[in-house]
Amino acid sequence: MAHARLFTDTRVINMITWSGTKKIKDIFEGYKNNSDTEEGGITSMNDKLNIRPRYQRLYIRENDKVWKDNLINSIICKFPINRVYFGVFEENGVESYELLDGQQRLITICEFLNGKESITINGDELAFAALPDDIKEDILNYEIDVTYCKGDEDARIKWFKRINQPNSILTEQEFLDRVPA
């Protein structure tokens, strides 16, 4: 485990971090996308992973077929994909997680497994259920690199801003829209 020290406004934010892997099938377990309902949440790992914490932006890859196909094809080809970051906290004595980075990837993967997305392979549109069993198993057993970040909510939000800063994709307004003042 490493101790990360984030310097923000002359304050030090302490977090404990460690790395590991998670199989896609373990992340997908109990996946629920209620983003179109009043509940509005997206969870997996039997409600232990909040894929869209309040500070995350909305899913922006909905119409980006090439990006989604490339992601799933990378997994099928066993190419590495970018790591994801889980914020770790305790809720009612149970260790739970919220996704700090990797929302677009995890939603795309879970929606594909759920049958809501298909991919183009050799010109054919295929849903997960239509794939050969060995490819389905390879996808489900694919291991995603995870960095776990344990700290209070303020530290997790600061960490989220820090790891998303180099991408310059998340605008300050997008961040302000997601986090109440």
Please provide the spans of the model-predicted regions.
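Basic- and aromatic-enriched surface patches that contact anionic nucleotides/nucleic acids
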Residues: 4-22, 29, 56-62, 69-181
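N- or domain-start disorder-to-order transition segments that initiate the globular core
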Residues: 11, 15-50
